Amino acid sequence: VRTIVGRLLIALGGFLLVAGLVAAIWAPGVVKKTPVDVDSVTHLSGQGGKVDASTGEITVGPVVASSITKVDTEASDDDVAVFVSTSCLMKDEGDVPDCVDADDPRLLNASTDLFATDRTTALTVPNGRYVPAGTEQATGLQNKWPFDAKKKTYPYWDGTAGKAYDAVFQREEDVQGMKTYVYKVVIENAPIEVAEGVPGTYNSSKELYIDPITGAIINQTDVQTRFLDSGTQALDLKLEFTEQQQRTNVDDAKDNQRSLKLVTTWIPIVGIAGGLLAIVGGILLVLREGRRRPDDTTTDDVFADGTESPRH
């Protein structure tokens, strides 16, 4: 019986060992990828206002913003995730939805972007077949950092300026109980169209708070101004993720961290350690059973009282 149990343990140990090694070597490259089931809304709030064409003055008041992000699953593949992102900036008046119609007086600005990113590095890839012809070619990071983010400078795409800028690592900071890496993006006097056919300049100082394990953006602040070429200020804006949005992002990131740790750490540890223990235990059982087995010749030559049979 011990031999049978031992052999079963050896077989089980071999299975666990292989499973643990596969999880350790193969799993990180599979699970540390941007998912293709993204369908999220990010909420920001702050103060802002745009110039009143009749008076030439800016009335600053409470504003809200939303970013609606979805993955186009049909256009995406194993290596690339294709995103459709719609952003709306609105006056915080009444019951404001995620976005309002173009003729709604509460609307301050709206835009829709299509882009494709590498599911491993999170960097934007060439548009190619992933987005419609004529779509602006972006570069750099956009809606997340890579898994296992580093304390270094990354290129970060700014859709308003139409250019990638350096996102420079600044510090570590706690957000809602989660350690984040803070990166700063500074844009000065970037030439833009303040309105259709109206040239001007754009300034922005962004700070992005990143979960270094998953690369998720936990919080973001943005201080932004836009000016006409005449020097008249056209937009004044200060935005940050809402407190609820930050809590949601932290909870989601922690859930993803636990899933990653299970697959990349605990399954390999349990598989490899458990497999080795089972193999060693199985071998010991087989060897012990072999040592306990009596010698047939010796048994035949000895009487029950312990005396040897006579030799002829």
Question: PLM ranges: what are they?
Answer:
Residues 2-148, 257-261, 284-292:
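Extracellular or lumenal secretory-pathway regions
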Residues 2-8, 258-312:
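Juxtamembrane interface at the cytosolic side of transmembrane helices
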Residues 26-31, 190, 196, 228-233:
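A generic "cationic amphipathic patch" detector
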Residues 59, 168, 184, 221, ...:
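Ser/Thr- (and often Asn-) enriched beta-sheet segments in non-cytosolic proteins
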Residues 70-76, 222-236, 265-275:
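A broadly tuned preference for mixed-charge, low-complexity surface segments
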Residues 112-114, 121-125, 134-139, 149-152, ...:
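Charged, low-complexity helical/coil segments in non-catalytic cytosolic or luminal regions
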Residues 130-219, 226-227:
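Membrane-proximal low-complexity regions enriched in glycine and acidic/polar residues
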Residues 210-256:
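Extended, hydrophilic extramembrane loops/domains of integral membrane proteins
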